[in-house]
A protein has these predicted regions:
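Long, charged, low-complexity intrinsically disordered regions
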Residues: 1-93
Length: 93
């Protein structure tokens, strides 16, 4: 069976242009809706790589959210930072 990260995403959500709080809130809503609609599906969260020397706060907080939702066991089965480092692939439960 091929690795789940080689599957095309069933849905994509772009967090560009949002504040960190908006991005995390909307990402969680998106993931919960998608987990109900597409159990076992794969979705992409586009965070961007961060600007200049300011780090990547949306990416960092999104990673924390994904870990929390994975540990909770009802929404996220697994996730991976894509090679571009500007998006996550997420396997839903």
């Amino acid at each position: 069976m091929p690795n789940w990260t080689s599957r095309p995403a069933d849905a994509t959500f772009d967090l560009h242009g949002l504040t960190v709080l908006e991005a995390v809130t909307r990402a969680e809503q998106f993931l919960r809706v998608q987990a109900r609609a597409r159990p076992g599906g794969v979705v992409r969260l586009i965070t961007g790589r961060g600007r200049g020397g300011g780090g990547a706060p949306i990416r960092t907080r999104t990673r924390t959210l994904l870990k929390t939702l994975r540990e909770g066991g009802r929404v996220v089965a697994d996730f991976a930072l894509e090679d571009s480092e500007g998006s996550f692939l997420v396997r839903l439960r």
